[in-house]
Amino acid sequence: MASLRDIRKRIRSVKNTRQITKAMKMVSAAKLRKAQDGILAARPYATMLDQIIADLSARAGDESLSHPLLTARPVKRVELVLLTSDRGLAGGFNSNVIRRANRFLYENTNLESIRLSTVGRKGNDFFRNRGQNIRKDFGGLYQRLNYRAAADVAEELVASYLNGEVDAVHIVYNEFVTAISQTVKVAQLLPLQTLGTPDQASTAGSTSLVDFKYEPDRQSVLDRLVPQAVNIKLYRALLESVASEHGARMSAMENATSNATDMIGNLTLTYNRTRQAVITKELMEIVSGAEALK
């Protein structure tokens, strides 16, 4: 049986751990709110871009509108961009998305090549430790995450696509649903997939369909907007991943705090029982000694 001193040390240790997990939960909750604000701010812009591009494509009429980032070609070489976190203690956040990336690699072994790029230290460490060749690790992106930083990454991926190095670019990430729920998603970044028709784009957004007039011409507008649509799509995926990370960590730390509280209760009960047993034993020894002196 553990001594009272050992049990007290364990209680003190668990209490210290509970303080840490509680603080981490509060920090993650604050960061989650900020990440959610970013998602909400980007959503109307992204939806309107999709609507305009779909409108341009659907209302082209006799015009020959095209853009290389909208044109699909036979897929032989693919780049997979994996979004994980830099830190752990986030439940199944990283393991789920890494498992999905592994499945993507396994399901597409018929391709000529699959290049892997990573955002986040956890995914990079996992695949490097297993001998997987990583084309590029966009390290430190989360520390400076904004639209411009995401656009820099997107422009590098676009250059690879336009140069013919890859025929498609996919991103695998955690899509934010709620603070306690995230969905692993594989999304095609290039060639860009629009919502198809202007009616579909309008239905997906909050704005009603507008018959736009484009100046100076449709092709010029399309050339300007398509790269921006790629940028915002990657930026939204990064924001979704960040929000999912903080939601998963907040949930994990809440569970850890709850478990620590339960453990403290059990240890306190054990401590009291052990203390009672020690006192009872001492009383019995005193009584026995007194009886022996009679």
From Swiss-Prot:
**Keyword Methyltransferase, does the record have it?**
no
Record Pfam families: ATP-synt
Instruction: Name the InterPro entries on file.
Output: ATP_synth_F1_ATPase_gsu, ATP_synth_F1_gsu, ATP_synth_F1_gsu_CS
SUPFAM superfamilies on file: ATP synthase (F1-ATPase), gamma subunit (SSF52943)
Task: List UniProt keywords, sorted A-Z.
Answer: ATP synthesis, Cell inner membrane, Cell membrane, CF(1), Hydrogen ion transport, Ion transport, Membrane, Transport
| Subcellular location per the Swiss-Prot or TrEMBL entry | Cell inner membrane
Question: What is the membrane topology here?
Answer: Peripheral membrane protein
GO BP, sorted A to Z: proton motive force-driven plasma membrane ATP synthesis
Q: Is Ion transport a UniProt keyword of this protein? A: yes
Which family does the entry's similarity section mention?
Belongs to the ATPase gamma chain family.
Give the function comment from the record.
Produces ATP from ADP in the presence of a proton gradient across the membrane. The gamma chain is believed to be important in regulating ATPase activity and the flow of protons through the CF(0) complex.
Q: Which PANTHER family match?
A: ATP SYNTHASE GAMMA CHAIN (PTHR11693), ATP SYNTHASE SUBUNIT GAMMA, MITOCHONDRIAL (PTHR11693:SF22)
The cross-references to HAMAP family, in alphabetical order and at most eight, read: ATP_synth_gamma_bact
Query: Subunit structure of this entry?
Result: F-type ATPases have 2 components, CF(1) - the catalytic core - and CF(0) - the membrane proton channel. CF(1) has five subunits: alpha(3), beta(3), gamma(1), delta(1), epsilon(1). CF(0) has three main subunits: a, b and c.
Q: What is this protein called?
A: ATP synthase gamma chain
Q: Which organism is it from?
A: Myxococcus xanthus (strain DK1622)
The gene for this chain is atpG
